[in-house]
Structure formats: structure tokens, C-alpha cells
Regions:
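Sec-dependent bacterial lipoprotein signal peptides
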Residues: 1-20
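Bacterial lipoprotein signal-peptidase II cleavage site
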Residues: 20-34
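Extended ligand-binding regions for polar small-molecule ligands
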Residues: 46-50, 96, 100, 164-168, ...
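Extracytoplasmic small-molecule ligand-binding "clamshell" domains
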Residues: 51-131, 360, 364
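Short helix-initiation/N-cap motifs at beta->coil->alpha
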Residues: 54-55, 109-121, 169-170, 207-222
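Bilobed "Venus flytrap"/periplasmic-binding protein-like clamshell domains
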Residues: 68-77, 87-103, 136-137, 156-218, ...
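Acidic, polar ligand-binding/catalytic clefts
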Residues: 96, 100, 108-176, 233-257, ...
Length: 373
């Protein structure tokens, strides 16, 4: 009897199990498929992220054989196209110097002109490997935008430019632009800085912004803008190149209204590429510390100590960085030292290096490269 009872109980339980399983299959078949699909999507996203994390940008550039570098299209002295459509300027030559360090050839590069609105997306999407595009290093750009910044190549500051005939002088200040139509680039720290400065001073301005500083400048020339504002170096370039013969433009205030540390910008978490970019800048500054430039660098090959290491001699560190031992010798030989670039592109605009914040620390400036060892 006991055995018969247990067999009946087992049969009942088995029946319940089959019914429950059947009902469960009816209710959850679509959910199960959705779960599988979601899991597959998650796996795909994980795969993309893993692939991106595993892709070493320095290796990719060396395999590709060229560097993609973004610059401004309208920054006089820093990046403008010549009559042959080739970008020339301080920033453009820093792009070339980086190409030399990584690939050994200043011509192994595609220099791409970008607007202020395009520049960060171009890095994030991989259109460019690097920006040398008068881009200010800020907290939000370093964190929220997801960029990494290299050493400052130009310490700048925002200033304003207006016409003397409108009552402005070099001693004018921001308070003197009350009621003025002020024009600048859209989507820049410049736009934010001038709006904030006006608010803090309790003055009223009409702020008009444009995508391209060529348009800003043209509006100023035509009288549609009373004042224009951007980095001081940019205003110096515009004044030198575009001031009409019948007008006198003046830049003010003497003390810039902001800090604008400009330098190379690249995507996050690419430390080997970042090292190559950063040490290209440092090498060009260290060369100046020793009085080495494009014209005389051959005289210093085989030097002892830090300079010898920098130029590829005994104890060099470039090989460990994934670069050629003489990478920085080639940078100086093919492109130049920091002061070579300044003399070539910025001095003709009236920008003075000696004694400025952009001079070496030994001359009272802020340029202080770490030691090459």
C-alpha cells in the first residue's frame, strides 16, 4: 500500500511540473528572446569598448604611416592655408613636429582644418588623432568632454579690440564696452568669458556670435560690431593683417580678462601616444635651453648628458617610448625648436618671445620642461 501511494503521488507531482513548464513557456518565450537579444547587444557594446581600449593609437598611427592633426582654419600666425592650400603656422608646425617624432617625416601628415564646433567631435570620432588648434585647457574639457591635454605651447589670455574713432584706447577696460555690440566665436571659452565679465561688472552688451572668426572680423571691419574679442594673439594677428588704412584698431585691456593655456589635445587613455606628443613639445623647449635650433643641431650630435640623450645618444629613452632613438633630433632638424617656430610664425606679427610668459623659465617665462633622462 505504501509503495502504491508513493507511485500515485509521484505521478501527480510530475503532472503539475509538466503543466507549469508548459504555462511558463507560453508566457516567457518573447521575454526570453528579448533577454537573449539584450545580452547580445551588451556583449557587442562590451566588445566595441574592449576593442577601443585595446587599440593603441601610437601603434595605429605607425601602421597607417600618417598622422591626422586638426588645426584652425583662420588663426593668423597659428594655422592658415597658403596660396597652395598648405597649412602654415605655429600650430601647424607642432603637428608636423609630432609626425616627425612618431613617423620620422614631417610630410607624413594630414592636416585637417576644423571649426571650434567641430574640433572635439573630430577627436572623439577618430577623424583626427590630435588637435593643435588654439584650444584652451579647462576643467570641464578635461573631464566632461573626455579629452586629455598636453603641455601648454602658448600661454594666452582673452582681450578685446575696438576702433580708436569709437573712443577706445589701450587703457580702456571691459567696463567701457557698456552698450556695445560685441562679436566673437560661438561655442568657445571666449564667448563665456565675456558674458560672465559683463554680468560681474553689471554692464549690458549685445553679444553676437559666429561660427568662423573670419566672419567676426569681417563684421567688425564693416561696422556691424563695435568690439570683437578672442585670445590676445588672435587679435594681434588680425590687427597686423586686416586693419584698414583709414582705421586704427586698439587692443585692450593690458591685463587679459582670462587665462587661456593653449596646447595639444587628444583622446583619453592613450598614454603611449600622449607621451610622444608631450615629449615632442618638451624636446623643442629643452633644445632652446641648450641654444640648439634647426640651423645648428648637427653640431650637437654626440653631446654628453641630457642633450646627448635627447638627440639619440647613449642613455636615450626614445626607444622605450616606441620611437626612433633619434626622433627628437629629427624633430629639431626637420621642423625646429620652440623658438624657431616662434620666429617663423609669431615674431612677424609683432609678438615678442624674450621676457614673455611664453619664454623659458630661465628667462622669466613659464616654459619649464621636465628633464630628459
Amino acid at each position: 500500500m505504501r509503495k502504491h501511494f508513493l507511485l500515485k503521488l509521484l505521478a501527480v507531482l510530475l503532472g503539475f511540473t509538466l503543466v507549469a513548464t508548459a504555462c511558463g513557456d507560453d508566457d516567457s518565450s518573447s521575454d526570453s528572446a528579448a533577454d537573449d537579444s539584450a545580452a547580445a547587444d551588451d556583449d557587442a557594446e562590451d566588445t566595441v569598448e574592449a576593442t577601443q581600449a585595446e587599440t593603441d593609437l601610437l601603434d595605429a598611427i605607425q601602421d597607417r604611416g600618417s598622422l591626422n592633426c586638426g588645426v584652425s582654419t583662420v588663426s593668423i600666425g597659428f594655422a592658415v592655408q597658403d596660396s597652395d592650400g598648405i597649412y602654415q603656422g605655429f600650430d601647424s608646425d607642432f603637428c608636423r613636429a609630432t609626425a616627425v617624432a612618431i613617423l620620422g617625416d614631417a610630410g607624413a601628415i594630414d592636416i585637417i582644418g576644423l571649426t571650434a564646433a567641430e574640433r572635439f567631435t573630430a577627436v572623439q570620432t577618430g577623424q583626427v588623432d590630435l588637435l593643435h588648434r588654439n584650444t584652451t585647457f579647462t576643467q570641464s574639457r578635461d573631464s566632461d568632454v573626455g579629452m586629455d591635454f598636453g603641455p601648454t605651447t602658448y600661454f594666452d589670455g582673452q582681450q578685446l579690440m575696438a576702433r580708436v574713432s569709437d573712443g577706445f584706447s589701450s587703457s580702456s577696460g571691459v567696463a567701457d564696452i557698456d552698450g556695445a555690440v560685441v562679436c566673437t566665436n560661438a561655442g568657445t571659452t571666449t564667448e563665456k568669458n565675456i558674458a560672465e565679465a559683463a554680468d560681474l561688472l553689471g554692464i549690458t552688451i549685445t553679444l553676437n556670435t559666429f561660427e568662423d572668426f573670419d566672419i567676426v572680423s569681417q563684421n567688425f571691419i564693416e561696422g556691424a560690431c563695435d568690439v570683437i574679442t578672442t585670445d590676445g594673439s588672435g587679435l594681434v594677428g588680425r590687427k597686423a593683417e586686416q586693419q584698414p588704412a583709414d582705421q586704427e584698431w586698439v587692443i585692450f585691456p593690458g591685463q587679459p580678462i582670462s587665462k587661456e593655456p593653449l596646447g595639444p589635445t587628444y583622446g583619453q587613455n592613450q598614454s603611449r601616444f600622449a607621451d610622444a606628443v608631450n615629449w615632442t613639445v618638451y624636446a623643442m623647449l629643452i633644445a632652446d635651453e641648450y641654444g640648439v635650433n634647426q640651423a645648428n643641431v648637427d653640431d650637437f650630435v654626440g653631446a654628453d648628458g641630457e642633450l646627448g640623450r635627447l638627440l639619440g645618444g647613449e642613455g636615450e629613452v626614445q626607444s622605450a617610448m616606441g620611437l626612433a632613438p633619434d626622433a627628437f633630433y629629427q624633430v629639431i632638424k626637420q621642423v625646429g625648436s620652440y623658438s624657431d617656430l616662434w620666429d617663423r610664425h609669431l615674431a612677424p606679427l609683432g609678438l615678442t618671445l624674450p621676457g614673455s610668459v611664453n619664454d623659458l623659465w630661465t628667462n622669466g617665462g613659464l616654459m619649464y620642461p621636465p628633464p630628459a633622462r
